[in-house]
């Protein structure tokens, strides 16, 4: 059963990758595919894929997803709280000692362009930390959440990760992939993923 779920999730990720490529054909940089994976990177990718699958299984526990009348509010609440929680965590990963041992692996890629593959190319400890943050957020907000908002939030996070690392210029009123691309280029800016309230507050927002 777990193997079947793993295959389904991987197919879903491939679908998200294709969506990210269809949304925009405008690349932000000509310097794409500037890094070749080593054995350590491949091990990290495999570990992260398995960890994400186990986390998703734990998150839903085979429950039936029912749409609540509070779905829009719950989803917006999740997106904002997740962004505000993840940004300082991401900022902490850029501390010189933590960065050298953990986060540097993700920033080997200065011009990400392979969507999910480049998004997941990170140290296992970084992945575990991010999943623990996600689990903590769901646990805290669980009394007011519905399964549909949790499921759609996971989908949007995965899609956002694919878009942010696609190398493609995608933007709307509240979201620009260029922000995360600039983070990979310059480092100490744009630690948020979507709304950048944290970055605007501490002065690290760059566009």
Short names for language-model regions:
Residues 1-142, 191-207:
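Non-catalytic, topology-defining segments of multipass membrane proteins
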Residues 143-201:
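Functionally important transmembrane alpha-helices
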């Amino acid at each position: 059963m777990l193997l079947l779920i793993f295959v389904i999730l991987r197919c879903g990720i491939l679908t998200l990758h294709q969506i990210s490529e269809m949304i925009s054909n405008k690349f932000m940089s000509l310097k794409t595919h500037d890094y070749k994976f080593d054995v350590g990177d491949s091990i990290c990718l495999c570990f992260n894929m398995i960890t994400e699958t186990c986390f998703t299984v734990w998150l839903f526990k085979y429950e039936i997803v029912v749409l609540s009348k509070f779905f829009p509010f719950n989803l917006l609440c999740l997106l904002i709280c997740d962004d505000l929680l993840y940004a300082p965590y991401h900022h902490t990963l850029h501390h010189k000692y933590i960065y050298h041992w953990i986060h540097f692996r993700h920033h080997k890629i200065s011009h990400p362009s392979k969507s999910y593959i480049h998004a997941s190319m990170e140290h296992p400890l970084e992945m575990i930390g991010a999943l623990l943050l996600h689990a903590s957020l769901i646990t805290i907000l669980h009394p007011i959440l519905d399964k549909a908002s949790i499921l759609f939030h996971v989908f949007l996070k995965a899609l956002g990760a694919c878009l942010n690392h696609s190398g493609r210029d995608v933007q709307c009123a509240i979201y620009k992939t260029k922000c995360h691309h600039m983070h990979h280029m310059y480092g100490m800016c744009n630690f948020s993923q979507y709304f950048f309230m944290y970055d605007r507050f501490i002065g690290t927002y760059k566009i």
